[in-house]
Amino acid sequence: MKVIFTQDVKGKGKKGEVKDVPVGYANNFLLKKNMAVEATPGNLRQLEQKNKAAEAERQQEIEDAKKLKEQLSEIEVEVSAKTGEGGKLFGSVSTKQITQALQQQHDIKIDKRKMDLPNGIHALGYTNVPVKLDKEVEGTIRVHTVEQ
C-alpha cells in the first residue's frame, strides 16, 4: 500500500515522503497513529501543492537574504570601545555589541549567532565580519572600531 508520511518514522520514511509499505503495517500502525495517510490522487496533489508553496517560500527567503547582503555591503557600523595605552582595547568588541550598533545605526536586525567572529575584535580600525544570512547566502559587515 502506498502511503504519504505525515511525520518522520524511524527506519521507514521521512515527512512528506511517498513509500510502499505492507498493508497491515499501514492500516494497523501508520494510519491509526496518524503517522501517514493513504496515497490517493487527491492527497498526492495536496502534497505537491505543499511542496510548491514551500519551494516558493524558500526562494523568497533566499531573495531576501541576497537583498540584505547587498544592503550590508554598502554600510559601515561604528562601534566605540575603551582603549588603553597604545590603542589597545580593554577586552574585545563582541558580536552582541555589533548587532546592537547595527540595529541603532541602520535599523537592521541580525542574530548575533549568525556572525562568524569567534574571538571578537581586539584592535581599533576596520574589520570585515562574515555573516551567515542563509544556508546559501553569506555576507560581510564592515565594522569600524573607534576609541571611546
From Swiss-Prot:
Q: Which InterPro entries match?
A: Ribosomal_bL9 (IPR000244), Ribosomal_bL9/RNase_H1_N (IPR009027), Ribosomal_bL9_bac/chp (IPR020594), Ribosomal_bL9_C (IPR020069), Ribosomal_bL9_C_sf (IPR036791), Ribosomal_bL9_N (IPR020070), Ribosomal_bL9_N_sf (IPR036935)
One cellular component term (GO) for this entry is: ribosome
GO terms in the biological process aspect are: translation
A GO molecular function assigned to this protein is:
structural constituent of ribosome
Keywords per UniProt: Ribonucleoprotein, Ribosomal protein, RNA-binding, rRNA-binding
Q: Does the keyword Metal-binding apply?
A: no
| Record bears the keyword rRNA-binding | yes
Pfam families for the chain? Ribosomal_L9_C, Ribosomal_L9_N
Q: What does this protein do?
A: Binds to the 23S rRNA.
Membership in a protein family:
Belongs to the bacterial ribosomal protein bL9 family.
Q: Which NCBIfam families match?
A: L9 (TIGR00158)
What is the name attached to this protein's record?
Large ribosomal subunit protein bL9
Q: Which organism is it from?
A: Staphylococcus saprophyticus subsp. saprophyticus (strain ATCC 15305 / DSM 20229 / NCIMB 8711 / NCTC 7292 / S-41)
The gene from which this protein is expressed is rplI
